[in-house]
UniProtKB/Swiss-Prot annotation:
Belongs to the imidazoleglycerol-phosphate dehydratase family. It comes from Methanocaldococcus jannaschii (strain ATCC 43067 / DSM 2661 / JAL-1 / JCM 10045 / NBRC 100440) (Methanococcus jannaschii). Keywords: Amino-acid biosynthesis, Cytoplasm, Histidine biosynthesis, Lyase. Pathway: Amino-acid biosynthesis; L-histidine biosynthesis; L-histidine from 5-phospho-alpha-D-ribose 1-diphosphate: step 6/9. Its main location: cytoplasm. This is Imidazoleglycerol-phosphate dehydratase. Coiled coil: none annotated. One of its GO terms (cellular component) is cytoplasm. Pfam families: IGPD (PF00475). InterPro entries: IGPD_sf, ImidazoleglycerolP_deHydtase, ImidazoleglycerP_deHydtase_CS, Ribosomal_Su5_D2-typ_SF. The keyword Glycoprotein does not apply. PROSITE patterns: IGP_DEHYDRATASE_1, IGP_DEHYDRATASE_2. The gene is hisB. Its EC number is 4.2.1.19.
């Protein structure tokens, strides 16, 4: 799961609200061990890992007796911090995906640009799916973009909130897999000669 000469990044974050451990192998095969205390969020992260072919471990303990906001936010922060460690040389840099799931369809485009920006239109019609407050899905992606220093744009349509959310996380995984592909022809893909602020 984490052997060999691979791009593996590890983040630990502990606050008064959460205790998060995250490890991701960008060059993995889609294996995962995820326990955030929020079963539907675990399912979404598993979908991201499986369809992006990332090996992912997430262990999170948060103040769920209050609500799920801090846990979802801080997992997003940790994933962003991990992704920000990716070497921005000899990779595709851009990634995109259009993923259907029955009635739902999600479109995601990302740029590992060294600049943080998130634009999304996921508009849930239900307050919860399982134990996950659907409003926190947008906040998760905002946190990933902010701490990962990447652009994330996404659009979601559909009727079923489970399908909409799952299609979105699958599309994010597929798009990120493309953006992180090694291509030694690329060098640094920027007319500035570097990918950072």
């Amino acid at each position: 799961m984490f052997g060999g000469n691979m791009r593996i990044f590890e983040v630990m974050r502990e606050t008064k609200e959460t205790n998060i451990y995250l490890k991701i192998n960008i060059d993995g095969t889609g294996k995962y061990k995820i326990d955030t205390g929020i079963p539907f969020f675990d399912h979404l992260l598993a979908s991201f890992a499986k369809h992006g072919c990332f090996d992912l471990i997430v262990k999170a303990r948060g103040d769920l007796e209050i609500d799920d906001h801090h846990t979802v936010e801080d997992v997003g922060i940790c994933l962003g911090l991990a992704l920000n460690q990716i070497e921005k040389r000899n990779i595709f840099r851009f990634g995109w995906a259009i993923i259907p799931m029955d009635d739902a369809r999600a479109t995601v485009a990302i740029d590992l640009s060294g600049r943080s920006y998130c634009v999304g239109n996921y508009e849930p019609k239900r307050e919860f799916v399982g134990d996950l407050a659907t409003e926190n899905i947008n906040h998760f992606f905002e946190s990933v973009a902010s701490y990962g220093m990447l652009n994330i744009h996404y659009e979601v349509i559909g009727k079923n909130e489970h399908h909409k959310a799952e299609a979105l996380f699958k599309a994010f995984g597929v798009a990120l897999d493309l953006a992180t592909k090694i291509d030694e022809r690329k060098g640094v893909i920027s007319t500035k000669g570097e990918v950072k602020l």
